[in-house]
Amino acid sequence: MPKKILTGVVTSDKPNKTITVSVERKYSHPVLKKVVKVRKKYNAHDENNKFKTGDTVSIIECKPFSKNKKFQVMDESK
């Protein structure tokens, strides 16, 4: 099974070696017949504390680092 790769914006970099990434996706609502935006937050491992709030990053699924941290930062997206 391939690993998920997601792109989002860093919303928090307060914890050590951890960033919170907000990923936005769009889908067509079956009843409303409108395109709806949904945001979800993921905790990701940032080994060198390199990324700051507002950066756009790509994250990849990996083995769990902790209870809620199951993604790792791949690289910065432009």
UniProtKB/Swiss-Prot annotation:
Key word Cytoplasm present: no
Described purpose of this protein according to its UniProt entry: One of the primary rRNA binding proteins, it binds specifically to the 5'-end of 16S ribosomal RNA.
Entry protein name: Small ribosomal subunit protein uS17
SUPFAM superfamilies in the record: Nucleic acid-binding proteins
Single annotated GO MF: rRNA binding
Keyword Ribosomal protein: yes
Pfam families from the UniProt entry: Ribosomal_S17
Listed NCBIfam families: PRK05610.1, uS17_bact
InterPro entries linked: NA-bd_OB-fold, Ribosomal_uS17, Ribosomal_uS17_bact/chlr
Family membership: Belongs to the universal ribosomal protein uS17 family.
GO CC, alphabetical: cytosolic small ribosomal subunit
Subunit note: Part of the 30S ribosomal subunit.
Keywords attached to this entry: Ribonucleoprotein, Ribosomal protein, RNA-binding, rRNA-binding
